[in-house]
């Protein structure tokens, strides 16, 4: 609203852990400690910090119950939702299921619940989950991310297919990028700003409190 710009949001797929099982059998703290070679105490401090930042934005992050299972099918459901104009609703519902409810979003029951909450046709949802539908969409997104955009972590944003922004950025930075994008309409190449916390295969940065 401040920038006076009407936005259309399109979500793309990017898996941080493609080999993850549908449900983790160890706690999220244990999993992250193993993945990033940290102590459990360090990981728990990191997650408390994230929870505090989330709370400031009105988001309840119950990190103690989070279960980071495989997200491939969740990405497929998001693509189904986007085909119905419900992409952002699907993402919000998945974030809520994972962050607040502590549900394993790699499991079918959770995905069916999310789909029902946002009004997707249960028959179409079953058709997707019982097949490979939208699998090519997920793989194509990830191929573009890795090979063309050189994405290594999330979050990652692309504006007007020309200006890229990586990491957890304050709203002021987004407004600056909107302005930059509007003022460089004839620019064809993608420029990237990466000076912000990201999560990738090797680390997960969280700003200091």
Segments from the language model and where they lie:
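C-terminal cap of thioredoxin/glutaredoxin-like
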Residues: 1-4, 78-209
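Structural alpha/beta surface segment adjacent to cysteine/selenocysteine redox centers
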Residues: 1-98, 204-205
